[in-house]
Amino acid sequence: MPPTLLLVRHAQALHNATQDWSIHDPKLTELGEQQSRELHESLKASKIGNEVELIVVSPMRRTLQTATIGLDWMIKKGTKVMLDANWQENADKPCDTGNKISVMEAEFPQYDFSTVDPSYPDKTTNLSSNPYAFTEKAILARGQTCLKALYDRPEKVIAVVSHSGFLRTAVCNRMFFNADWRVFTFDEDAMAKSAEKKFILKESEETEKKGGGMGRSDVGVFGITENDFPPEVQDQMKDEEAKGPAKAEELDEVNKQKPT
């Protein structure tokens, strides 16, 4: 039987508070640290929180900090932590781009970074084949990659600490307030009817009606909007695919020269 998923959004980070998207891989604010402590209390008091057998975390700074503070009690009792670049945020702005693995290993020596894709945090080269590219095609595929990997896991309950944009557009079509959490199961009936054989989640009635486990998130279904993915990137990817490797390399060089 596939696992139940406890999906968590990271707590408030500097870019959330300042609306400054130029901050590279921002850390949590003081409020974010407090939200993480509240997450700790909320999950520890819940039945599902005490059933978690695996923790999957995006290797970005804000998600690692949220897990370190909010899920510390799970970690201290021996729950395995697995870092996975597939759960990183969508965009290629500095705030949504991670640091080199060597940098993060020095900051978070308690975690094993050997499971992180060596190409992380690159999102801008070879757009047509880069699994982390900021394109609708790549992000939706990445969401399915994440769900397939968890569907096949032996654990009964898995917690994931990720990002609002990725969770909403590619995983579960829900909004998450900072440090809030929701519970999902795999919707086997919907999956069986899916012509594309997609992995589809169904939210628990409790967190759906409440607006997250802490009741801080918007209620409802929220899909992809026209502003989620830049049209110029989508057009550029099509251009790469149409004109072949030589054109792709040329476009990569142009990307590197663009201001961020």
Task: Please give the residue ranges for each predicted region.
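Acidic, low-complexity terminal tails and accessory targeting/binding regions
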Residues: 1-4, 46, 91-110, 168-260
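Generic beta-sheet signal
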Residues: 5, 53, 156-162
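Glycine-rich phosphate-binding loop signature in dinucleotide/nucleotide-binding domains
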Residues: 46-50, 150-156
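A short, structured active-site edge motif that brings together acidic residues
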Residues: 59, 77-97, 117-121
